[in-house]
Regions:
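Active-site-proximal alpha-helical scaffold in enzymes
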Residues: 77-108, 139-173, 213-219, 328-341
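N-terminal extracellular/periplasmic Venus flytrap/periplasmic-binding protein-like
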Residues: 19, 162-228, 232-238, 316-318
Length: 341
């Protein structure tokens, strides 16, 4: 296995180089023993909309400002999973023997873009030909999924409200959360309607941020820490982009497939998971993840949320103790590694 150690999250209005440098230095400083960036063999950095700032070659641009000049670097683009896959690539580089110490991270600066450019860079992560050009946005996509779920199962919008309230509650303890405030059930329920049935409080914010983790191989990790965080497994899967191609829009088959593989590799089951950071770009996405990861049975995700079983110290599996994307924020390419440790 390969351990990861060190996490830096930044949600401040500053330049991209400054955001990455702060996150990277936070990660370097968090290593228990002396660590220097020249000890890094490779770097993988996730980003989605860097082209929106008319900048390319992201990884090289950022790493040269954090002491990694001359190192092999790569930008990873895989929509909102970009830095999650950067982490997976870093892990595989170590497992293959090509590197001993690797940094994986992500960055996104969305709030300098106009609303139109934001919508464009978000929209191109979906199906452009059949959805984006027809006017379907991601809030609209998830609203359709939510309405179908309510039609098929014993659930209402109130269950999504509970998820929003929970994540804001968890985010109160996260010093780098984008939206760090308590939200009552009534306020979340009566929020501005974005795409029926989803209100403002069902939607994550558009965030600026950077995050990174440092991975080291088994035979060198003792140089850096006596208490590493071990990566036991990593799995991935994909699905159809367009909703009309999916056999069901009330479950995420890619999540189910990846979870099954990851649990098998690690030798565990969903019942063994105490904490889970899941992708709640919209509250309905967390409800789906709760089911698809096996924390609740199919069709019972609403009940899981209703009974606060994902709330800290109240259920068997704490969901999004960081506040999730809803509270911590969603800087696209930086979200994956931001969820890791």
């Amino acid at each position: 296995s390969s351990p990861s150690r060190g996490l830096g999250d930044v949600y401040k209005r500053q330049g991209m180089k400054g955001m990455w440098a702060e996150a990277a230095v936070n990660a370097f400083d968090s290593v228990d023993k002396d660590f220097q960036p020249n000890q890094i063999d490779e770097a993988y950095i996730g980003s989605v909309a860097f082209g929106g700032g008319q900048l390319g070659n992201t990884a090289a641009l950022l790493t040269e400002h954090t002491g990694m000049q001359g190192k092999p670097v790569r930008r990873v683009e895989n929509a909102c999973a970009s830095s999650g896959f950067a982490l997976r690539d870093a892990w595989m580089a170590i497992k293959s023997g090509q590197a001993d110490v690797v940094i994986a991270g992500g960055i996104e600066k969305m709030n300098d873009l106009t609303p139109e450019r934001k919508r464009f860079w978000l929209g191109v992560s979906g199906d452009t030909e059949w959805e984006r050009l027809a006017g379907l946005t991601f809030p609209g996509t998830y609203a359709l999924m939510a309405r179908r779920y309510f039609h098929e199962f014993d659930s209402t919008h109130d269950d999504l409200v509970n998820i929003s309230v929970k994540n804001h509650y968890h985010g109160l303890d996260n010093e780098v959360a984008h939206i760090r405030k308590d939200v009552s059930f009534d306020k979340a329920k009566s929020g501005f309607m974005v795409a029926d049935p989803l209100t403002l409080y069902d939607c994550c914010p558009t965030s600026d941020g950077a995050s990174c983790v440092i991975l080291a191989a088994d035979h060198v990790v003792s140089q850096f820490t006596d208490d590493p965080v071990w990566i036991k497994s990593s799995a991935a899967a994909s699905d159809y982009l367009a909703l009309h191609d999916r056999p069901s829009i009330t479950q995420l088959m890619a999540t189910q497939k990846a979870a099954k593989r990851a649990y098998s590799m690690a030798g565990i089951s969903a019942k063994d998971v105490d904490i889970a950071e899941v992708h709640d770009c919209f509250t309905i996405a967390e409800l789906f993840a709760t089911e698809d990861l096996g924390f609740s049975e199919r069709g019972t995700g609403g009940q899981f949320a209703r009974e606060n079983r994902g709330r800290r110290n109240e259920g068997t599996t704490c969901i999004n103790p960081s506040g999730g994307l809803k509270s911590k924020g969603h800087p696209l390419g930086a979200t994956g590694t931001g969820q890791t440790v």
